[in-house]
Amino acid sequence: MSTIESVLKETRSFPPSEAFRQQATVSGMQAYNDLCEKANADYEGFWADLARELLSWKKPFTQVFDGSQAPFFKWFADGQLNVSYNCLDRHLEHNANKTAIIYETDDGQVTPISYRSLYEQVCQFANGLKSLGVGKGDRVVIYMPMVPQAIVAMQACARIGAIHSVVFGGFSAGALRDRIQDAAAKVVITANESVRGGKLVPLKATVDEALAMDGCDSIEKVVVLQRTYTPCSMGARDITWDALTAGQPLECEPEWMSAEDPLFILYTSGSTGKPKGIQHSSAGYLLGAANSFRWAFDYKPNDIYWCTADVGWITGHSYICYGPLAMGATQVVFEGIPTYPDAGRFWRMIEQHKVNIFYTAPTAIRSLIKLGADLPKQFDLSSLRVLGTVGEPINPEAWMWYYEVVGGGRCPIVDTWWQTETGSAMIAPMPGAVATKPGSCTLPLPGIMADIVDESGAQVEPGRGGFLVIKKPFPSLVRTIWNDPDRFKKTYFPEEFNGQYYLAGDSANRDESGYFWIMGRIDDVLNVSGHRLGTMEIESALVANPLVAEAAVVGKPHDVKGEAVVAFVVLKGIRPEGDEAKKVAAELKSWVAHEIGKIAQPDDIRFGENLPKTRSGKIMRRLLRSIAKGEEITQDTSTLENPQILDQLQEIA
């Protein structure tokens, strides 16, 4: 495998303002460097100090790290704690009346929930689960809308030592069945339906369909939240949320867990092949989530924080359910979508709730640019202090719009690189210390030993692309793949790298300043005439064109070049057809050739009103690869937000 070439040239840099730097918890590069040096000098001591500072222990640990069974690492293994206790109980003495959650429904109703109220709801539901026979080590599948009860269910599982597996509410019955079967779950928690963008989406009916398939015999009970007035089928196996919690005590003694006991399994999305059950620990995971929340967002106790993710994904686990609550934060939880009832919804909510820290996905940013690039200017967004992005690399042009239009040039952009498997942010600017660059996730957080290597495991020189690895195990790292340790080793600690480094599966390069630039997944790397090009860079070039709102690039086999470049493009205006489409396609091909070079010029350009995305906003690139190759689509498309656009994307301009 030859070295991946980096062709994206981005030179803009934005240091923290003096005003921001002065109020920041980690202020200035010297403070950042001091933390990094502390981690380098005494790696175990660095993490042990953080674990003692940020977590409350029932039984303090004496052993920090155990690598004797590498790559099955252990952290704080002889310590005991409870994750729910760390997120709720410990705040009650001084902050019982502090708002934990500001919940806004799809139709705009707002309900504040205090830490005391959240604690009582979690205890009641935990007692309800215990009454169903759920206990330590049992698996519970949660298939819920984005409502506070989803967080209650997760925290209740953590409280009694049950292992939760949240399945995103957009997954099909087949995908749900696969996860129930792999986890051998005992209980499913769901709702009659969810409400998204004014539309009702049945959930209980999907659960019933999944449980009617082979392989779900482990399920004993289904708990159903009545989210709307729509009735749903209720059999002998089913019980309503209200019936389960009625009369349950408002206190529930936490189950004290070993630091290494599993907290949850989260299956990586079905759009990336056979689901892998990513298993996270209790203490190490919580430490990563809480500390990175504090550092990456410069969190202050009076902040109003809003992450727009769904709890069905790792971002919703780490930066809604666990990290913010462990730190005692107040956060907005939103049931709806950014474009309902109109494209001003996010900005209106930021104004109304006086949000200080806003964390969303580049996909949402790009779609909001398309729907109204000037809309944010109609709202008072002066409360914002930090803007974050997550889920995929952000194109420099989208970054600049986010920075200038949403943040008014005041707010650092915290572009966070991390994964389901890492549990918490790995590479991200500490906003009071690190200058940001559009499109770069900047520098590793202190204690994260990230590097870029070639296929032999040797470090590559600046400006050359390679494989992103993390050279030392860290507390929030995935512990194994549920029931598949061999796959865990082969996937993340492959023999080619002597089994030593965590292989992220992303290609990246590092510039002369040490900044990391994610170029895309290793399988999103194109080999065009012997040149390895990251799809991210071609997409960035396309999006830099004033006509283009969004672009996704994939490869398809080519007799001469090895791979041809196929671009799927959404324009800011209406979708072109016929001669107009040919004209715009020719213009965009010339544009890319000018921006990057002829080598990266797309062979085919196809226009759609949108790109095929899962309901969490991820572009389904495997689907695009099938379309590009002219293959029949065999992938599960049940998580697609917009299946009707597939026909448009078959047409070559």
Swiss-Prot record:
Its cofactor is Mg(2+). CoA binds at R196, G197, G198, K199, T315, S529. Its EC number is 6.2.1.1. ATP binds at G391, E392, P393, D415, T416, W417, W418, Q419, T420, D506, R521, R532. It comes from the Bacteria. Belongs to the ATP-dependent AMP-binding enzyme family. The modification N6-acetyllysine is found at K618. Pfam families: ACAS_N (PF16177), AMP-binding (PF00501), AMP-binding_C (PF13193). This is Acetyl-coenzyme A synthetase. InterPro entries: Ac_CoA_lig (IPR011904), ACAS_N (IPR032387), AMP-bd_C (IPR025110), AMP-bd_C_sf (IPR045851), AMP-binding_CS (IPR020845), AMP-dep_synth/lig_dom (IPR000873), ANL_N_sf (IPR042099). It comes from Laribacter hongkongensis (strain HLHK9). It catalyses: acetate + ATP + CoA = acetyl-CoA + AMP + diphosphate. It is an enzyme of class 6 (ligase). GO terms for cellular component: cytosol. Catalyzes the conversion of acetate into acetyl-CoA (AcCoA), an essential intermediate at the junction of anabolic and catabolic pathways. AcsA undergoes a two-step reaction. In the first half reaction, AcsA combines acetate with ATP to form acetyl-adenylate (AcAMP) intermediate. In the second half reaction, it can then transfer the acetyl group from AcAMP to the sulfhydryl group of CoA, forming the product AcCoA. Mg(2+) binds at V543, V548. Keywords: Acetylation, ATP-binding, Ligase, Magnesium, Metal-binding, Nucleotide-binding. GO terms for molecular function: acetate-CoA ligase activity; AMP binding; ATP binding; metal ion binding. GO terms for biological process: acetyl-CoA biosynthetic process from acetate. Coiled coil: none annotated. Acetylated. Deacetylation by the SIR2-homolog deacetylase activates the enzyme.
